[in-house]
Amino acid sequence: MERLWGLFQRAQQLSPRSSQTVYQRVEGPRKGHLEEEEEDGEEGAETLAHFCPMELRGPEPLGSRPRQPNLIPWAAAGRRAAPYLVLTALLIFTGAFLLGYVAFRGSCQACGDSVLVVSEDVNYEPDLDFHQGRLYWSDLQAMFLQFLGEGRLEDTIRQTSLRERVAGSAGMAALTQDIRAALSRQKLDHVWTDTHYVGLQFPDPAHPNTLHWVDEAGKVGEQLPLEDPDVYCPYSAIGNVTGELVYAHYGRPEDLQDLRARGVDPVGRLLLVRVGVISFAQKVTNAQDFGAQGVLIYPEPADFSQDPPKPSLSSQQAVYGHVHLGTGDPYTPGFPSFNQTQFPPVASSGLPSIPAQPISADIASRLLRKLKGPVAPQEWQGSLLGSPYHLGPGPRLRLVVNNHRTSTPINNIFGCIEGRSEPDHYVVIGAQRDAWGPGAAKSAVGTAILLELVRTFSSMVSNGFRPRRSLLFISWDGGDFGSVGSTEWLEGYLSVLHLKAVVYVSLDNAVLGDDKFHAKTSPLLTSLIESVLKQVDSPNHSGQTLYEQVVFTNPSWDAEVIRPLPMDSSAYSFTAFVGVPAVEFSFMEDDQAYPFLHTKEDTYENLHKVLQGRLPAVAQAVAQLAGQLLIRLSHDRLLPLDFGRYGDVVLRHIGNLNEFSGDLKARGLTLQWVYSARGDYIRAAEKLRQEIYSSEERDERLTRMYNVRIMRVEFYFLSQYVSPADSPFRHIFMGRGDHTLGALLDHLRLLRSNSSGTPGATSSTGFQESRFRRQLALLTWTLQGAANALSGDVWNIDNNF
């Protein structure tokens, strides 16, 4: 110890003056950070007086004060106290290190949450100058609400609904120019348009679609009037069919199975089905699968609100809807429809081979009166007749469909606010612009909200807000033909978007009522939606947030709110095709369908009457929801996506598989590997959480690495074992095809209905063991691949699969 003390004294004698590290506050672009610099001697004294959070001093250097006459007593005392001095210095150093670490970590804890970067500062002052200092979550929220309140949502909805905007029309071309000019006026970083040349189907004015009675001798008789020749089903098969009429409820598979079980076979017949529950495309596909000749689709008055003060759909009005079971241009499946692109001579497998035509309630009433046969089940009954509905069969009908295909240019409009730290990661929000009729609820509301959000965020940027990630605002064309504009864009940039798009928010069908709120979304966004619902006031329950309104009727908020993404949503392709989490939220009318959707009666006036004057408040609530989602997704340091949520999704689906464990065991099959893959995913998600929690928050390289892993979770659930050209919707939970969990479950159910009932049966219509083994293997390896990818680098993967 004496020798150590001597060396320490000699080192001090060799140091001519003291040197210490000073941390000083930095102004300008790095304001709020600490900067390290070396200060020597007296030059550092003034700085230390200004800001020195911690100062460690050893013994004073020799020569720094007048020499003492006698150092021997001091040296002797020093030798006796040396162990204590060293121990004290070590304790001070350790304490200072821990204090400094905590202080450094704490300086970024304004967020109050390990996955939040926008601070939850509850002490916000309303008249804060946004140009001064750091913007906390409450600052951004107040800024957003301040600028959003200055908009003219209702007037934009009214004006947009008055304009003709069928895809490819002159009116749509004029609206496209106006909206692009509106984006340009907001001084965004980038504004541009892309054009696609797509195949759209329209009625032939010279040869309208027709419906006739046919007598027993096969002679065509009286024509049934189709009141509006403009109402049709895009992508219906062309031609004419004749068959007996059968009533098939909503045209779901279970409806058709029930029909067959009651002795009425759909094969070779025309089906009369009701609007609603599933899409037109699904109705026609199901009818085709059950051998029907054609489909007539009508709006059943019993399915809509019977509240006298509210308007109802005219009994002479038919409902428009495309019948392509897919999205995008069905004549270029899997390929973008840019000009001069060469396409293979193949059409989408989702195009039907049977014709379909919408009819009004009045025509349906005439048809239902002619039906004989068994009485329909009670839940199939409607309000068109004074007597019960029958299943049929009824008289023969002849349906003629003469729609024609036209190559049509469509235009998507883009506006971008570039991000500050991660400009190559995009938070995307879009709304359909086109409409077959007035389209007030269908697309005018979404277009108005999109334009208002562009204006609001542009104003926020002018007042100091700079998002971490880029915001991409898009106005889609061709939406009424099956999200054609959005899907073609995704197909054109597929190799880029799954790496760069963080989330997609859809504003389509946002206001269809004001009683119920539904969010059709990916599981990754469920927790974020819950958080944002707590920040937005209910438009029709004063003093309550939307979250409080929801849990008042059902404590299980997600069971009340969350729904799967439907194929007829523009958000569907983002998730099922590209692997980007997406959400589309809607206010509904007390679980009753909005009666005017996809009709010529979807006007501003009818929408206003249905909402009884609350349209501005509900549209404002949607804008607040969307805007606060955008702030969180574009500004948070760590993406607020709940990557662990898919573990619960897998568990729920495994519960459905367990029902068949006994049947599988009898055939020597097991679900063990599915359980193992889920376990690996859960462990990988928890490991990532722990890594994030224990990491240095100011390390931008680590932050970006974590964000990349988080934002690609949805992509991990796209099956890598099927071709995007053959099976574009590769998502194993939300997609369509033999690779999905739904297809595997449907196949398993054949075990119970397999006529042979013996292991190894290979009936083409029954359970096929070889096919099931392949389905199970591909599904399991997709799950395992997701777990491995979430684990990070290959040397971090720890499983015994």
Swiss-Prot record:
Q: Where mainly found?
A: membrane
Q: Motif Endocytosis signal residues?
A: 23-26
Q: Which disease is it linked to?
A: Hemochromatosis 3: A disorder of iron metabolism characterized by iron overload. Excess iron is deposited in a variety of organs leading to their failure, and resulting in serious illnesses including cirrhosis, hepatomas, diabetes, cardiomyopathy, arthritis, and hypogonadotropic hypogonadism. Severe effects of the disease usually do not appear until after decades of progressive iron loading.
Q: Where is the composition biased (Acidic residues)?
A: 35-45
Query: Pfam families per the record?
Result: PA (PF02225), Peptidase_M28 (PF04389)
Q: Which residues are glycosylated?
A: 240, 339, 540, 754
User: Does the keyword field hold NADP?
Assistant: no
Extracellular compartment residues: 105-801
Keyword annotations of the record: Cell membrane, Cytoplasm, Disease variant, Disulfide bond, Glycoprotein, Membrane, Receptor, Signal-anchor, Transmembrane, Transmembrane helix
Could you identify this protein by its name?
A: Transferrin receptor protein 2
Reported effect, residue 455 to Q: Hereditary hemochromatosis modifier
Q: What gene is this protein a product of?
A: TFR2
Family as reported in the entry's similarity comment: Belongs to the peptidase M28 family. M28B subfamily.
Q: Which GO terms describe its biological process?
A: cellular response to iron ion; endocytic iron import into cell; intracellular iron ion homeostasis; iron ion transport; multicellular organismal-level iron ion homeostasis; positive regulation of endocytosis; positive regulation of peptide hormone secretion; positive regulation of protein maturation
InterPro entries reported in the protein's UniProt record: PA_dom_sf (IPR046450), PA_domain (IPR003137), Peptidase_M28 (IPR007484), Peptidase_M28B (IPR039373), TFR-like_dimer_dom_sf (IPR036757), TfR1/2_PA (IPR037324)
Against Gene3D superfamilies, the record matches this protein to:
3.50.30.30, Transferrin receptor-like, dimerisation domain, Zn peptidases
GO terms of molecular function: co-receptor binding; transferrin receptor activity
Q: According to its UniProt entry, what is the function of this protein?
A: Mediates cellular uptake of transferrin-bound iron in a non-iron dependent manner. May be involved in iron metabolism, hepatocyte function and erythrocyte differentiation.
Domain of life (superkingdom): Eukaryota
Q: Which residues does the annotated region (Disordered) include?
A: 16-45
UniProt subunit comment: Homodimer.
Residues assigned to the Cytoplasmic compartment are: 1-83
Cellular location(s): Cell membrane
